[in-house]
């Protein structure tokens, strides 16, 4: 059984600044980290490995120069995966879901797999699209919002998905893609032994050409900017008479 767990390197949100001149986001001083939601995907894959005994877990990511960071690679591998595959190219800097999914699908197809696990979304965009788009690209079953993995055999996966007023139990044939919610587990903190052992695990670095990806995206992000701040009018209405109430209602109408 070969399980691929996908993750994304995202900027640490506490280090992102806003350029006052044009409202664009400045990532120059922001360190990269594993997207918080993808930690659940990594943990889910490694728990399955422990249950099955003979499974192999491969961590996989698509991105830009952040994936060249040795510390980041060690962080991923210290959490349990046996191997790491990264697809690196400038075109994947701040890639949109369709671009990321196309590259992940091509890389997963080259690597081979039985089950591919994603987080429900990424910490930066949280579009919640990549897992389903990967399934579509590979023409295999895909389920998002998975809150529990009930069973996994050589041919079938059974999971639970919590909806607003019910819990679904779903079974799908392998190979398949699932996107797990944060309810599925609590990611473990790597031990010192695991951190030291991570440096010995294999890492494969691929380019778009290595996975046969030459397509030009149909759309691209032109700019990412913070919304313009509007000054408050600071309208103060004193009193509780009919005129004051009418003025209050009129001001409410203007903003609704």
Swiss-Prot record:
Keywords noted in UniProt: Electron transport, Transport
Name by which UniProt lists this protein: Protein FixA
InterPro entries cross-referenced by the UniProt entry: ET-Flavoprotein_bsu_CS, ETF_a/b_N, ETF_b, ETF_beta_N, FixA, Rossmann-like_a/b/a_fold
Pfam families according to UniProt: ETF
Family: Belongs to the ETF beta-subunit/FixA family.
Superkingdom of this protein's organism: Bacteria
GO MF assignments: electron transfer activity
Pathway the protein takes part in: Amine and polyamine metabolism; carnitine metabolism
Matching PROSITE patterns: ETF_BETA
